C-alpha cells in the first residue's frame, strides 16, 4: 500500500518519467521551461492533472512552496506548518522565492511577522541545476548589490531547490551580515516529519531530476539521527504510469 507522496515541481513538469539514483525512484515531470514564471492558474491546472496519480496516498508532503495555496485546506497535505509557524514568529524576514510566492505573499499563511519578498528565479534555477558556487555567488552579487540586510533576522528560502544550496547561502550571507538565520520550507518539513521504519519505505516522489541530491541529504539526515541504520537503505516503491 502506498502511504506517502511527495509533491514537487520545478523546471519541468510533464511526462512523469523515471530516474533511478541512490536507491531511490524519481518521477520527473517536465512541463515548465523556467521555474517560477507560471501563474496560479497554470500551477493549479497541473496539480489537478497529477493529483490522480497519488489520490490513494494517505499523506502528501508538499515540497513545492507554490503548491501550498492549492493544498492548504487538504487534510492529507503536510508541509511543515507547525515548524514554520514556530520558526517564523517575531522576526523581520526576507523571503527569497518565485514570482508567484512573492505575488501571493505565501508566508502570511504561517506568520504575522513583517516580510519582504524578493523574486529570484535565476537563483532557483541555478540551485535546481546544481551550478557551481562561484556562479551562484555571481548571481547573488547581482541580486544583492548594495542590499541592506541589517534589518532582517531571517532569510527564508521558499524553494526546495534553494534548500539544496543552503550551506552556500549560510556562507554567503555570513560575509555580509554578522548574524542572520537561514531557514527553508524543507527545514520545516524535516523538523515536523515523523519517520517510521519499515522493511521498505513505501514512498514515491514527484520531483525534478536536478533535485535528486535532496534525497541523498534526507537519507544522511535520517542516518545522523539513528533513524536509518548504517547498512539500511532508504527505498521507495515503484509507481507505474497508467494510460500515459
Give residue spans per PLM region.
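Non-catalytic structural scaffold of enzyme domains
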Residues: 1-244
Amino acid at each position: 500500500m502506498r502511504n506517502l507522496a511527495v509533491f514537487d515541481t520545478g523546471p519541468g513538469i510533464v511526462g512523469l518519467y523515471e530516474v533511478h539514483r541512490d536507491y531511490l525512484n524519481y518521477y520527473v515531470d517536465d512541463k515548465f521551461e523556467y521555474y517560477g514564471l507560471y501563474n496560479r492558474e497554470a500551477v493549479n491546472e497541473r496539480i489537478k492533472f497529477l493529483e490522480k496519480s497519488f489520490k490513494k496516498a494517505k499523506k502528501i508532503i508538499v515540497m513545492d512552496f507554490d503548491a501550498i495555496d492549492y493544498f492548504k485546506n487538504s487534510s492529507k497535505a503536510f508541509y511543515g506548518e507547525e515548524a514554520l509557524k514556530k520558526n517564523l514568529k517575531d522576526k523581520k524576514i526576507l523571503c527569497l522565492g518565485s514570482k508567484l510566492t512573492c505575488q501571493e505573499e505565501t508566508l502570511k499563511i504561517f506568520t504575522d511577522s513583517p516580510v519582504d519578498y524578493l523574486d529570484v528565479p535565476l537563483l532557483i534555477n541555478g540551485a535546481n541545476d546544481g551550478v557551481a558556487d562561484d556562479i551562484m555567488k555571481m548571481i547573488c552579487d547581482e541580486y544583492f548589490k548594495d542590499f541592506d540586510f541589517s534589518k532582517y533576522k531571517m532569510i527564508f528560502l521558499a524553494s526546495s531547490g534553494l534548500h539544496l544550496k543552503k550551506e552556500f547561502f549560510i556562507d554567503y550571507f555570513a560575509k555580509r551580515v554578522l548574524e542572520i538565520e537561514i531557514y527553508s520550507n524543507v527545514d520545516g518539513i524535516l523538523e515536523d516529519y515523523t519517520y517510521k521504519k519499515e522493511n521498505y519505505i513505501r514512498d514515491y516522489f514527484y520531483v525534478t531530476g536536478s533535485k535528486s541530491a535532496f534525497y541523498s541529504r534526507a537519507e544522511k539526515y535520517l542516518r545522523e539521527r539513528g533513524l536509518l541504520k548504517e547498512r539500511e537503505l532508504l527505498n521507495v516503491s515503484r509507481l507505474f504510469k497508467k494510460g500515459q
